[in-house]
């Protein structure tokens, strides 16, 4: 077997050592070594960058390939010591010539980081004698194409709480004939027994044998020129040459693109010109030169020269890269943010949340508890958790894996629960319009007064794609009471003046625009239209207007006959101007649609109420093949609104068959979600992406839409595996439904990558064409259609756009063709039936037939927030700006069927969503959402049937019709997207032009990034994204760009992004690792990361099968922590506003250090948070005293602490463990504490026995506590068991329950675990238990206690109760058996504490 020597270099930088909480002063040293699997023959060497020969204690040195940092002394707590050592590990590997790339990807590289300590400085130089006190091992997941560029803060163990900041850069730098001898692993090495020295040395193979294969015999001199090399040998040589050159070229491109991105995003770096080696061109040139040679020796020599030439380029670039980025503080900051975001995103897996009505807290939710227990078991055994990929550089001890991470369920009790993706801080709205009025979205001045006398929440707003900047902390009105007038500032500004500008631009990658020159935020003319231009749309453009945008304007008059109905209507007119009008980025300006939406508040909208002012189209200037497709929406009064079902229709009408089938396999539809509020003290929350992976609409107490069984509908015309395989999302429409239809329509879904096995034949390079220019159907046809369909609400959608992967601001075209669709299919008229109202009949969207054009079948976008996709078609996602209103979503209602599992192969003659297919069956499911119901307003977007004509063109029809000021477009289809050429950005941005909303918005994000490919440089100005970049440059989507979206800290509330389309950082990481694939793994045939893909599919499958009642934090755009530990520049604390005092109280037989880790992770997670921790120690000597005594001690301690340090207190929070929680509650009732009651903020109860230990289900623990009480004469244990008084109502705990306290907190967070047998689970959660229900003597007293405790909480307006149910991954030990392990895991499990605080818990202390 021919073998090749590959050289990989790792640059490891040790930046800073942080003393978090070390116990011992003295001398410390970090030692780092790289370990490579002994199964692969290798040679390892290490060198320190820029080191001279002299070595001293105060400089780094190398011993046997282990790097010793300089020795440093630690004297103070919170001390930061700059290390600034950089080392290069060079690994020469002997690789099989057949699968070099795979072999390199599978090498197990590990970086071992050890902490050594001694009192004697000199002892640390004694390599053998200096003791190692703690060690961590980092797994480095290296991929030869992308290299590895990552930063990890490595935290040592509990007893040595300190962090060393480590940056790793790695690249494949050489491939060549083996030049050094390698030691073969000996027998038994696969068992770990064989060391590197046990095997034999490998003899070096001759170059010819390497090139031509083992079967090659060198001709003797006598044969001379008559010797002819066999065809097999020649083929072997050419293939070998091609594979090696291709791998080196990819490695070069990956490093170069990463370098370019770094230079672009970090202005402080010196900008240098980097030589570009175009992969295909260079490869074809090298191969063609080799083809011309016939002499075997010359062929071998030429191959060697080519490899040496490419290697020299690679080495030059690598050296240049290291010289630029090594130990550069800005690069470190950039990579730190990226790592933190991915890590938090990974922690958010298997973390569920659900919202309930506040009153539900008083009920016995036995089913909920049982569901949690069953789910935790299912998750542990599910492929979802077991297939979760690792981080690019991970440490199992601190990052965990599926086997060690806890599973957490959160139940939040709020006034207006949302069963959708909204956060509790963005509650539901009632938005009926008070009087008949024309809602002209153009009128900025009008504030829309909302009369919420109905329980329906409605939005009359069409969202725009780019959420303008919004102050994420601004007030959002919570569920107005009936009869209350509400004028929502920005929300209704949206409503009153939101002009929806959708400009669909065409992007073409010109040869002159290199991959790295994606536009960086400056707005080009194309696609940006100021408000002033709106009125010009009233005139029909003449032939000379070829370059002017066409605005389609629709007024919908509303009447107030039935205020519970409001129809959003959307008109899009997508037009292309002549190709000559492209700007420097190759953009076509396309027509804009100006939509004026009015709420029609009657059961039926008649056509006379809606005037289609203009559906003007460009007469000239359209591509010769291009035709405009006008989607018109027809609203017919009088039919009851059945849940829509969208189906593909073949020439023969399938509608009738759908009538019967639609109820069978309905999937729940998803709802839109509201904007996230950052830093709010309430956890942001949103929904599971596919569950109803959706954008939660403001309109959301929605009824479920249902699709007919996709199987029945899809079989006739859907290609079975293409989309399913291709979809990063596992192919369910649910994810697509996640977007309001139009939204999806104008975005690319990542839908076109073929998956490995059955799609190999689809050349990935063809995928690049997925965004090529579509043809637009003729304006004449479109206009005719619009006229013939005098619809009540015109619905014109941009259905086609020219697009390649380069985009201009203002363009919302990200098209992604489906590689599996047939070329050149004609698309006949497509009709989509739309139910606009509960009482209304269908409307039709007509798509005139266009020759050889394609459009994406778009799902219905229901104002109630759910999108419905036509089965069998992909949908594209678009980010829309939505009034900040929240939607409800039925957890049971699933977003659509696996309609997307398959890609349309040929377009059916008719796309129809027939009204006959509608049924009421979905309504009942959703009505249980709340007492409110939302009218079923559905705004169907055009069916997106995707077909590709011969040029791979594709168009989209989309109608963003959303109602949420910052919708997350939840769950955009995360299908592997088609690769866009040249790695340029394909942004989606529309300009929403309401200045009033703009001024209050902090968000810059407006793009919907599907998978990882779309970054709107315009929406995210690059300078604001130093730390984390949205995915840019790469439009390729390797599967790792999945739902692990990340949010740059500068844009904390990325409304407008669903989890699936939130910003992805540029991770530049190996394909198999968790997170997003590098931006530069851009455009050609990047392989899909099967591991990430399978994880995503497993996750979707898990959510589907289990019908999860609740949602995953991983589907949220913004999590609790967006700032990494140890940010480079902490804001100076301004103590004028007062500090936040956090009092930590330990439990029985505990001490002040018990809550040390809790304190540590809050401090690390909230740098500059003005937090002052009081670790209570007054009771640590005697926790067996009675509660009154301990209460007095704690109260004295708190008041003394405040007075001693003269603290100006703004807020007080309490964190208690076990029995400490009772002491805290007792303190709240004391008169001396009354002054501080109005400052109470958060009460975090960790396994607190609030109801005592009366109904403990562990006999062993009960017996132990009884014995301990007898031995210690413990008053507290007596009181916990209600034996301190014969009359239960005179017991301490009962009387404590009657006193006020908990309702003064903003957040009451109860953490409990069924595995904890020290404290009964129901007691920690303050809820009823089965045994108490059966107990006629004590049960009623127990119930009274619960009501006494929770009643004031329910009545308190500003108090939120949150319960957490934690399932730890515990080893089988005696501690686990008796329940102690879980009881103390909330204190000493780093994995639980980091997961809890980073994902959700930090919000309670902000």
Swiss-Prot record:
The annotated regions of Polar residues compositional bias extend over: 804-816
Query: Which SUPFAM superfamilies does the record cross-reference, listed alphabetically?
Result: alpha/beta-Hydrolases
Record-linked Gene3D superfamilies = alpha/beta hydrolase
Spell out the Pfam families in the cross-references.
DUF3657, DUF676
GO process annotations (BP): lipid metabolic process
Q: Record keywords: Phosphoprotein included?
A: yes
Q: Does this entry carry the keyword Phosphoprotein?
A: yes
| Annotated InterPro entries | AB_hydrolase_fold, DUF3657, DUF676_lipase-like, Lipase-like
Q: Which family does it belong to?
A: Belongs to the FAM135 family.
What PANTHER family does the entry give? LIPASE ROG1-RELATED-RELATED (PTHR12482), PROTEIN FAM135B (PTHR12482:SF3)
Under which name does UniProt file this protein?
A: Protein FAM135B
Q: Which organism is it from?
A: Homo sapiens (Human)
């Amino acid at each position: 077997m021919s073998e090749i020597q590959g050289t990989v270099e790792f640059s490891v930088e040790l930046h800073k050592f942080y003393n978090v909480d070390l116990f011992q002063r003295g001398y410390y040293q970090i030692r780092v070594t790289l370990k490579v699997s002994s199964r692969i023959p290798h040679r390892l060497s290490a060198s320190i960058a820029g080191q001279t020969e002299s070595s001293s204690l105060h400089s780094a040195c190398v011993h046997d390939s282990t790097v010793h940092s300089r020795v440093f002394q630690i004297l103070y707590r919170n001390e930061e010591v700059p290390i600034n050592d950089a080392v290069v590990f060079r690994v020469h590997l002997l690789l099989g010539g057949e699968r070099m790339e795979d072999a390199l990807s599978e090498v197990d590289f590990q970086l071992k980081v050890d902490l050594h300590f001694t009192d004697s400085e000199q002892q640390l130089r004694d390599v053998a004698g200096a003791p190692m006190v703690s060690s961590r091992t980092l797994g480095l997941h290296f991929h030869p194409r992308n290299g590895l560029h990552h930063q990890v803060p490595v935290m040592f163990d509990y007893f040595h709480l300190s962090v060393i900041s480590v940056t790793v850069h790695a690249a494949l730098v050489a491939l060549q004939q083996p030049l050094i001898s390698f030691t073969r692993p000996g027998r038994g090495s696969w068992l770990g027994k064989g060391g590197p020295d046990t095997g034999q040395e490998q003899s070096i193979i001759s170059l010819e044998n390497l090139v031509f294969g083992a079967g090659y015999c060198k001709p003797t001199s006598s044969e001379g020129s008559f010797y002819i090399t066999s065809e097999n040998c020649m083929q072997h040589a050419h293939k070998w040459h091609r594979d090696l050159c291709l791998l080196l070229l990819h490695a070069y491109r990956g490093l170069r693109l990463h370098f370019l991105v770094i230079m672009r995003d970090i202005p402080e770096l010196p900008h240098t010109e980097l030589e570009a080696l175009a992969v295909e061109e260079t490869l074809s040139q090298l191969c063609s030169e080799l083809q011309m040679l016939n002499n075997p020796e010359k062929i071998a020599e030429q191959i060697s020269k080519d490899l040496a030439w490419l290697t020299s380029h690679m080495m030059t670039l690598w050296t240049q890269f290291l010289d630029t980025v090594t130990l550069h503080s800005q690069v470190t900051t950039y990579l730190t943010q990226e790592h933190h975001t991915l890590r938090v995103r990974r922690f958010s897996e298997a973390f569920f949340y659900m919202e309930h009505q506040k009153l539900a807290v008083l009920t016995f939710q036995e089913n909920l508890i049982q569901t949690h227990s069953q789910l935790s078991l299912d998750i542990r055994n599910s492929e979802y958790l077991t297939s979760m990929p690792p981080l690019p550089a991970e440490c199992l001890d601190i990052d965990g894996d599926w086997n060690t991470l806890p599973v957490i369920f959160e139940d939040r009790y709020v006034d207006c629960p949302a069963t959708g993706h909204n956060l509790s801080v963005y509650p539901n709205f009632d938005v009926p319009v008070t009087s008949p009025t024309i809602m002209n979205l153009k009128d900025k001045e009008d504030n829309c007064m909302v009369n919420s006398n109905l329980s329906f929440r409605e939005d009359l707003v069409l969202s725009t794609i780019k959420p303008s900047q919004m102050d994420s902390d601004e007030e959002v009105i919570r569920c107005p009471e009936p009869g209350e007038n509400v004028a929502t500032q920005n929300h209704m500004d949206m409503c009153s003046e939101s002009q929806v500008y959708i400009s669909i631009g065409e992007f073409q990658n010109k040869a002159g625009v290199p991959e790295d020159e994606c536009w960086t935020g400056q707005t080009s003319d194309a696609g940006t239209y100021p408000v002033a231009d709106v009125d010009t749309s009233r005139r029909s453009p003449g032939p000379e207007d070829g370059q002017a945008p066409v605005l389609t304007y629709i007024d919908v008059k509303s009447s107030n006959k039935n205020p519970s109905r409001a129809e959003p209507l959307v008109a899009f007119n997508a037009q292309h101007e002549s190709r000559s009008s492209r700007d420097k980025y190759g953009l076509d300006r396309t027509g804009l649609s100006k939509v004026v939406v009015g709420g029609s508040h009657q059961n039926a909208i008649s056509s006379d109420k809606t005037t289609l002012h203009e559906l003007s189209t460009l007469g000239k200037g359209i591509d010769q093949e291009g035709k405009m497709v006008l989607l018109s929406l027809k609203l017919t009064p009088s039919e009851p609104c059945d849940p829509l079902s969208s189906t593909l229709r073949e020439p023969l009408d399938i509608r009738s068959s759908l009538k019967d089938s639609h109820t069978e396999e309905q999937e729940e539809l998803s709802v839109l979600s509201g904007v996230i509020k950052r830093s709010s003290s309430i956890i942001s929350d949103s929904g599971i992406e596919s569950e109803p992976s959706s954008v939660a609409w403001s309109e959301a107490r929605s009824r479920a839409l249902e699709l007919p069984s996709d199987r029945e509908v899809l079989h006739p015309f859907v290609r079975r595996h293409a989309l399913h395989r291709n979809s990063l999302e596992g192919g369910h429409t649910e994810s697509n439904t996640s977007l309001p239809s139009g939204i999806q329509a104008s975005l690319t879904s990542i839908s076109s990558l073929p998956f490995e096995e059955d799609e190999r034949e689809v050349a990935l390079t063809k995928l690049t064409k997925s965004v090529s220019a579509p043809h637009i159907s003729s304006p004449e046809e479109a206009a005719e259609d619009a006229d013939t369909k005098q619809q009540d609400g015109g619905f014109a959608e941009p259905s086609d756009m020219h697009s390649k992967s380069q985009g201009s601001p203002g363009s919302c075209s990200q098209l992604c063709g489906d590689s599996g669709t047939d070329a050149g299919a004609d698309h006949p008229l497509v009709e989509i039936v739309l139910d606009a109202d509960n009482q209304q009949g269908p409307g039709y969207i007509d798509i005139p037939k266009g020759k050889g054009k394609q459009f994406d079948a778009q799902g219905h976008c229901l104002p109630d927030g759910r999108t419905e996709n036509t089965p069998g078609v992909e949908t594209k996602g678009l980010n829309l700006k939505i009034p900040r209103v929240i939607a409800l979503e039925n957890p049971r209602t699933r977003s659509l069927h696996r309609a997307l599992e398959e890609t349309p192969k040929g377009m059916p003659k008719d796309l129809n969503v027939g009204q006959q297919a509608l049924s009421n069956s979905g309504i009942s499911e959703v009505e249980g959402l709340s007492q409110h119901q939302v009218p079923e307003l559905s705004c169907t977007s055009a069916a997106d049937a995707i077909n590709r004509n011969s040029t791979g063109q594709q168009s989209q029809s989309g109608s963003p019709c959303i109602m949420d000021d910052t919708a997350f477009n939840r769950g955009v289809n995360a299908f592997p997207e088609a690769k866009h050429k040249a790695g340029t950005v394909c942004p989606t941005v529309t300009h929403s032009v309401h200045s009033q909303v703009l001024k209050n918005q902090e968000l810059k994000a407006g793009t919907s990034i599907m998978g990882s490919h779309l970054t709107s440089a315009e929406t995210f100005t690059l300078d604001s994204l130093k730390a984390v970049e949205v995915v840019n440059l790469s439009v390729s989507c390797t599967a790792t760009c999945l739902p692990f979206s990340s949010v740059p800290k500068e844009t904390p509330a990325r409304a407008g992004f669903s989890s699936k389309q939130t910003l992805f950082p540029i991770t530049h990481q190996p394909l198999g690792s968790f997170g997003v694939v590098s931006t530069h793994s851009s455009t050609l045939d990047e392989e899909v990361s099967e591991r990430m893909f399978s994880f995503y599919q497993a996750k979707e499958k898990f959510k589907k099968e289990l019908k999860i009642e609740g949602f995953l934090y991983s589907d949220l755009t913004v999590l609790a922590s967006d700032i990494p530990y140890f940010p480079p520049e902490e804001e100076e604390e301004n103590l004028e506003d007062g500090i936040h005092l956090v009092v930590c109280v330990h439990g029985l037989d505990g001490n002040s250090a018990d809550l040390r880790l809790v304190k540590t992770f809050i401090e690390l997670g909230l740098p500059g948070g003005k937090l002052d921790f009081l670790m209570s120690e007054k009771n640590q000597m005697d926790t067996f005293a009675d509660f009154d005594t301990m209460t007095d001690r704690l109260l004295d301690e708190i008041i003394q602490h405040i007075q001693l340090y003269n603290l100006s207190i703004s807020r007080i929070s309490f964190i208690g463990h076990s029995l400490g929680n009772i002491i805290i509650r007792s303190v709240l009732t004391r008169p001396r504490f009354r002054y501080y009651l109005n400052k109470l903020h958060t009460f975090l109860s960790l396994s607190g026995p609030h109801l005592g230990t009366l109904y403990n289900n562990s006999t062993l623990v009960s017996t132990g506590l009884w014995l301990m009480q007898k031995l210690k004469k413990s008053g507290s244990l007596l009181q916990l068991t209600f034996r301190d008084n014969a009359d239960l109502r005179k017991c301490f705990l009962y009387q404590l329950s009657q006193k006020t306290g908990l309702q003064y907190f903003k957040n009451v967070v109860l953490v409990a675990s069924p595995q904890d047998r020290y404290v009964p689970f129901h007691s920690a959660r303050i809820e009823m238990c089965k045994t108490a229900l059966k107990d006629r003597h004590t049960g009623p007293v127990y119930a009274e206690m619960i009501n006494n405790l929770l009643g004031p909480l329910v009545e308190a307006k500003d108090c939120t109760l949150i319960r957490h149910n934690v399932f730890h991954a515990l080893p089988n030990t005696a501690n686990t058996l008796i329940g102690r392990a879980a009881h103390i895991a909330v204190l000493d499990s780093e994995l639980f504490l980091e997961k809890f605080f980073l994902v959700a818990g930090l919000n309670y202390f902000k």
